[in-house]
Amino acid sequence: SEAVAAYYVSIAGGDLHADKSNGSNNHDIKKKLRSIQAVVYDQYHYHGNYDHYEELENADLCSVIERRKGMPISLSIICMYVAKAQGWNIVGIGLPGHFICRLEANGERIIFDPFHHANIVNAVDLRRLLKLALGSEAELKPEHYQAISNRKTLLRLQNNIKQRQVDKHNFLDAIITLDTMRKIAPDEAELLLDAGQLYAQAKQPRAAINALSRYLDHSPSQYGRTKASVLIQQMKRQLD
């Protein structure tokens, strides 16, 4: 509602109606970040679930909202929702092994980490996060901190759920999650390869063959096509 929006903007030190009439934001970018911190973390007490990071609930938005704790990407989505409700320019950044946000206003940019109370992240922090995920030899490149689309953000969130289900050998649940991912990105051929592999792990060779055959019809990846062809032959032998 407008009352809620006015409350958020007031924390940032601004005027809701002035923003709308001018079509631009005149608030200091750090005040915007402080307003996100005040609302998401101080008022509603969201926080990163450091102690039980691998819990499936950390990637389930309904559970995150109920428990007020989650993983980097789920908390990033909460922060992005709050900022976008005010018309602020915010995007998600999918670092390998971590997820952060970038806020922009009046030509200034701030990168912050929703998993750690929306603290500002600098180049040194980015390198450290990258090396934690990819090893000490990894070097920070521009593609590592490029903004990703809302669709890719949702896919990454669902992939976190799927991976946790696979780790627990809940292959049928993982297939359901993957079906959701395919609805989000129906043209993403790699999801058919993932589906084929999951069906194979779930002891459903016919479904695996069907998904992998469809993958072969759509994928240009020679490596993926070879992998799919080998798995199809394995599934056919199970049916013999």
Residue ranges and their predicted role:
Residues 1-240:
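A structural boundary/capping signal
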